[in-house]
Amino acid sequence: MIDQTAFIHPSSIVEDGAIIGAGVHIGPFCYIGSQVEIGAGTVLKSHVVVNGVTKIGRDNEIYQFTSIGEVNQDLKYAGEPTRVEIGDRNRIRESVTIHRGTTQGGGLTKVGSDNLLMINTHIAHDCVVGNRCILANNATLGGHVSVDDFAIIGGMTAVHQFCIIGAHVMVGGCSGVAQDVPPYVIAQGNHATPFGLNIEGLKRRGFEKDTLHAIRNAYKLLYRSGKTLDEVKPEIEALAAEHPAVQAFTDFFARSTRGIIR
């Protein structure tokens, strides 16, 4: 179904069965598969491929040579009907690739809302990217990676499969991330190691002084106390009882499967 207010350039192909919302603009030389849904107000500049079982929300800007919903690069994939879901108001720049999920990973690759995916970003099968994230040019996420809200991943950085990038994290450019990065932390290097807290980012997002102080104390326990993670967990949990923002650390530890960067 194609809304009567949508614009589709004559050189583009929209297969029967695709759902194209109100005010969608599909520029020249695009291909839209039969199981694709594109929400109102979304713009495809030109030469964009959207295939597979893919749902794209409202008011996204998708630039040329981007590919969304194509077959993933997992050698075990055998054509199962897995999906891609993208939220609203994302800017997806040139030559971004977002692959469909696998049955082993839950069948879904998901990108939230209000993200900026810069040129040549790759989001592999079964990744989950939250809201208001920035992935800079040539950032690469391996399969099953989670990127939590407000995270920033620098250019030419690669994240190993199954890793978690916590909320408000900043990963510097040209880094290699092979373990989980706790919330609020700045990470850099190959292999990535912690370089303090993303204090400026937290200030821009309205974190109060007492909250920042509590987050600093949690960071010091984690990285400067000389104790093991198991030893500091109860202390961080006690701190979280007084300062809700610190709860992000304890929630993160419960999710972590690859160990945290050190």
Curated annotation (Swiss-Prot):
Originating species: Pectobacterium carotovorum subsp. carotovorum (strain PC1)
Alphabetical list of InterPro entries matching this protein: Acetyltransf_C (IPR029098), Acetyltransf_C_sf (IPR037157), Hexapep (IPR001451), Hexapep_transf_CS (IPR018357), Lipid_A_LpxA (IPR010137), Trimer_LpxA-like_sf (IPR011004)
Gene3D superfamilies, sorted: Hexapeptide repeat proteins, Udp N-acetylglucosamine O-acyltransferase, C-terminal domain
Recorded GO MF terms: acyl-[acyl-carrier-protein]-UDP-N-acetylglucosamine O-acyltransferase activity
Protein name, as recorded: Acyl-[acyl-carrier-protein]--UDP-N-acetylglucosamine O-acyltransferase
A Pfam family it matches: Hexapep
Location of the protein in the cell: Cytoplasm
Gene name as annotated: lpxA
Keyword Repeat annotated: yes
Subunit-structure text: Homotrimer.
Taxonomy, superkingdom: Bacteria
Pathway where it operates: Glycolipid biosynthesis; lipid IV(A) biosynthesis; lipid IV(A) from (3R)-3-hydroxytetradecanoyl-[acyl-carrier-protein] and UDP-N-acetyl-alpha-D-glucosamine: step 1/6
Protein family per UniProt: Belongs to the transferase hexapeptide repeat family. LpxA subfamily.
Enzyme superclass (EC): transferase
Signal peptide range in chain numbering: none
UniProt KW Acyltransferase keyword: yes
Its job: Involved in the biosynthesis of lipid A, a phosphorylated glycolipid that anchors the lipopolysaccharide to the outer membrane of the cell.
Keywords, in A-Z order: Acyltransferase, Cytoplasm, Lipid A biosynthesis, Lipid biosynthesis, Lipid metabolism, Repeat, Transferase
Reaction it catalyzes: a (3R)-hydroxyacyl-[ACP] + UDP-N-acetyl-alpha-D-glucosamine = a UDP-3-O-[(3R)-3-hydroxyacyl]-N-acetyl-alpha-D-glucosamine + holo-[ACP]
GO cellular component entries: cytoplasm; membrane
GO biological process, one term: lipid A biosynthetic process
